[in-house]
Amino acid sequence: MTEVVVVIGAGSIGQAIARRVSAGKHVLLADLRQENADAAAEVLSNAGFEVNTAIVDVSARESVHALVEIAIGLGDVIGVIHAAGVSPSQASPETILSVDLYGTALVLEEFGNVIAAGGAGVVIASQSGHRLGALTAEQDVALAMTPTDELLALPMLQPDQVTDPLHAYQLSKRGNALRVMAEAVRWGKRGARVNTISPGIVITPLAKDELTGPRGEGYRRMIELCPAGRAGTPDEVGTVGALLMGPYGGFITGSDFLMDGGVTAAYRFGELAPKPTTAAQATA
């Protein structure tokens, strides 16, 4: 039976992981825009991979389910790489929650119903999920366990509670990691694993939008002051993705792999840490 690797989001990171885990397998490359899928498929095809393309809107259940049907029609789904999403500079809070949070929950649910024994999935989250302050235990459980079609109705996600695109993005990415942790239990019953990767600033078209957007100065400061002193590359994320999806990652599931060049470390213990603004705060 043919083994199928599904790549959702035809960008640089999804391609980088796919190149490392898809040799001898059939790649189903899906994107919201056919031209993006076709361009990525040409690159992979020219590198010797067998590729089909599809259009998917991850914020629509019927679209994600249709992609599942295409995938199982090609063979056994042995891998799922979910790298689709929108950033704070690209969309409204409502769209970010719909695509990045709800869409990820849909992908995990729908592909968790068909993933083959021995299979593995990777969801691309973000360092931003680690920048969000602590949620309550009840909020953690709600993001992890609320039935998918009820997720966006949570009180904590309503427009009067989430008014800023960055807040929506941070909530979504924290939710991705929590959702994957919960889904790992269900995937495990099928003999499969699933994890998240939380990259920092990785040079992709999406990152370039952020670097030239309203928060660009802050992102450039992160690059300058993080321990690594540079941005990351899609190939570096691809290497971690290959570990998590391959045999050497066989004991890793329900986990989140933060790879941000030390930005989060610098925010907590280094030069990026928020500075007290008054003498009282400094001695508190």
State where each predicted segment sits:
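Conserved glycine-rich Rossmann-like NAD(P)H-binding loop of the short-chain dehydrogenase/reductase
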Residues: 24-39
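A glycine/serine/threonine-rich, flexible loop-to-helix segment
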Residues: 135-146, 202-225, 266-284
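Rossmann-fold cofactor-recognition segment
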Residues: 44-62
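Catalytic loop of short-chain dehydrogenase/reductase
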Residues: 87-90, 117-190, 201-204
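C-terminal helical subdomain
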Residues: 106, 161, 168-169, 174-177, ...
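Canonical Rossmann dinucleotide-binding motif of NAD(H)/NADP(H)-dependent dehydrogenases/reductases
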Residues: 1-28
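Conserved Rossmann-fold cofactor-binding substructure of NAD(P)-dependent oxidoreductases
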Residues: 59-75
